[in-house]
Design a protein with these regions (language model features):
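Core beta-strand elements of the Rossmann-like FAD/NAD(P) dinucleotide-binding domain
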Residues: 8-11, 186-196, 369
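Glycine- and aromatic-enriched mobile tails/lids
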Residues: 1-4, 9-11, 20, 28, ...
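N-terminal Rossmann-like FAD-binding beta1-loop-alpha1 element of flavoenzymes
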Residues: 13-40
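An anion/pyrophosphate-binding glycine-rich loop and adjacent beta-alpha core
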Residues: 224, 230-341, 345, 407-414
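Conserved N-terminal glycine-rich FAD pyrophosphate-binding loop of Rossmann-like flavoproteins
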Residues: 44-77, 81, 239-243, 252-253
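Glycine-/small-residue-rich beta->alpha transition segments that form the dinucleotide
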Residues: 194-196, 200-205, 379-380
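Conserved redox-cofactor binding core of oxidoreductases
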Residues: 104-188, 193, 200, 244-248, ...
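Short beta-strand to alpha-helix junction loop
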Residues: 84-97, 131-149, 159, 211-219, ...
Length: 572
């Protein structure tokens, strides 16, 4: 019945997502020298959408002879407060230089140079060495544009403006065998039937009042894997970038002013004109890690020392207008578009939801704990621990995307394409079509409620009372989702897609809240007002969350200190 009514595309490798991870996975698999079919599915348009393209700052890699893998590793673990998966973090660090070389020599990327022709590397917060490779302040555009060109030049199939609605099981419920896909333009379903599936949609904490990711991001991959039964890790760890632009009355508030500004010397001030980071981080000041700077800014705002629009000021003019205009042309232009003069004056900024450190639990081959399912990029957890260093994000995506492509290409040969469960498909379609044409609640007030509640209860600072209240709000909103009505046809129905987004954001929000309740300490991006100190004795461990019989279940496990212990580097 299903095959007669819904188109089925058969493929060897299904890649959900077309950012740094998805494109690198496709290229590595295509270049593996094996005759395999590859299908990329993306909500946006390949090369034009997603978070990787939005990367401004750069890409961390050990290239200078005076730098070392061990230094980058220590910086990454200190930044992550030592709950990183050390095996994954080490893979990131040793493979990042390989990927930079590959992107330049094989894929056509070109990064900024020093006068001697070597790759220029700039300073970023939380790092002991200047190791951030960049293309001006528009690094992501360079990387994604070149990767997309390479994908178009190979025998790789792709579907733009299509979204995965749910991962599909085989009839025995033992393997993931693809996904149910919705053609966003036509409003019609198809089935991507696959031997192996990679989830790398990009995270997207857009369930907060202020957020940095592109509007098409809604924690899709994380929610898909969670509902399929995959284990998740570190979901309490949500990064808030310190400098999201405040644009009064605009939905673009939250868009980033990149970390390189602070790395180069930009300073932060409260409304009283005080350079407040001198109080919170006397040594590092504005170059402290993102969690420290965001929390410091937030505390200034809460204490009544914020700007008229609820932020703080960033002052880049202290570096000299000519320096700012030369080194940060993208940021200068963006601010000019909104009537702000970044090179000559102070600009209002606020902490903004930016990145999930948590995600699907994977091994060093990007395999999840579900047969046939891989994850990479922001959808995968464990690499960054409690806080991601700026510059490690796009490195993570391209490094582990490549690893996933290699792994899938090696493992797909001889793997049987087993039938999918048609009953599951019918049930999913019934669920997601339910709001169409139904008289009911308006979706958008529910979304506004979620964003405000998460900002206040599951945000930069937390406590038990607020977390419980936030989780209660999430449960109430989940109940109301069954009462939402969506008007209009199926074709290009933005409200229907926003309903699907909201469904995923609610699942991700619940995982954040439940995991945050369990961690009764403060560590990295997770700050508890009722437990303000780090507690290595009891909480040097990871929390895992898994859906069992329709309900979330929490597990915990001590961190595997396989390469480095906190005391080895004086981290107490």
């Amino acid at each position: 019945m299903i095959k007669g009514s819904i188109p089925v595309i058969e493929t060897d490798l299904l890649i959900l997502g077309a950012g740094g991870a998805g494109l690198c996975a496709a290229l590595h698999a295509a270049d593996a020298g094996k005759k395999i079919k590859i299908l990329i599915v993306t909500k946006s348009i390949i090369g034009k959408g997603g978070c990787s393209r939005m990367v401004q700052g750069g890409y961390n890699a050990v290239l200078n002879p005076n730098d070392a893998f061990e230094k980058h590793f220590i910086d990454t673990l200190k930044g992550g407060q030592f709950i990183n998966n050390q095996a994954l973090a080490w893979e990131l660090i040793i493979r990042a230089p390989e990927r930079i070389k590959e992107m330049e020599t094989k894929y056509g990327c070109f990064f900024d140079r020093n006068p001697d022709g070597s790759i220029h590397q700039k300073p970023f917060a939380g790092q002991s060495f200047d190791r951030t490779v960049h293309k001006g302040d528009l690094t992501g555009i360079e990387i994604i544009s070149r990767l997309a060109e390479q994908v178009f030049s190979r025998n790789i199939d792709y579907l733009d403006e299509h979204r995965a609605v749910e991962l599909l099981w085989d009839k025995q419920g033992t393997k993931i065998v693809g996904a149910l896909i919705l053609d966003v333009d036509r409003g019609e379903f198809l089935i991507a039937h696959a031997r192996t599936t990679l989830v790398c949609t990009g995270g997207g904490p857009t369930m907060y009042k202020l957020f940095a990711p592109s509007l098409d991001k809604s924690a899709d991959g994380i929610a898909l894997c969670y509902r399929a039964g995959a284990g998740m890790v570190d979901m309490e760890m949500v990064q808030f970038h310190p400098t999201g632009l405040i644009v009064k009355g605009s939905n673009t508030s939250g868009t980033l002013l990149e970390e390189g500004l602070r790395g180069a010397g930009a300073q932060l001030f409260n409304a009283l004109g005080e350079r407040f980071m001198e109080r919170y981080a006397p040594d590092a000041k504005e170059r402290a890690t993102r969690d420290v700077v965001s929390r410091s800014s937030f505390l200034e705002i809460v204490a009544g020392r914020g700007t008229p629009n609820g932020g703080v000021f960033i002052d880049a003019s202290v570096m000299g207008p000519e320096f700012v205009e030369k080194n940060f042309p993208g940021m200068v232009e963006r601010c000019n578009d909104y009537g702000f003069d970044l090179a000559h004056g102070r600009v209002e900024v606020s902490p903004t939801a930016h990145f999930f450190m948590g995600g699907v639990r994977i091994d060093t081959h990007c395999l999840t704990d579900l047969d046939g399912l891989y994850a990479a990029g922001e959808d995968a957890g464990g690499v960054h621990g409690a806080n991601r260093l700026g510059g490690n994000g796009i490195a993570d995506s391209t490094v582990f995307g490549g690893i996933a492509g290699d792994s899938m290409a090696n493992n797909v040969i001889g793997r049987e394409l087993v039938p999918f469960d048609e009953t599951q498909v019918e049930e999913i379609i019934k669920q997601v079509e339910a709001p169409l044409g139904r008289e009911g609640l308006d979706l958008y007030p529910l979304r506004d409620t979620l964003r405000l509640s998460n900002w206040e209860k599951l945000g930069i600072t937390r406590d038990e009372k607020g977390l419980l209240e936030g989780l209660q709000t999430i449960q109430e909103l989940k109940g109301k989702m069954d009462q939402v009505g969506i008007a209009g046809s199926r074709v290009c129905n933005i409200s229907w897609n926003d309903w699907l987004n909201m469904r995923n954001l609610l699942d991700a929000s619940e995982m954040i809240g439940r995991s945050a309740l369990e961690r009764k300490e403060s560590r990295g991006a997770h700050y508890r007002n009722d437990f303000p100190e780090k507690n290595n004795k009891e909480y040097l461990k990871n929390f895992f969350i898994k859906r069992e019989k329709g309900e979330p279940k929490i597990y915990e496990r001590p961190v595997a200190l396989s390469r480095l212990r906190p005391e080895d580097v004086g981290f107490e």
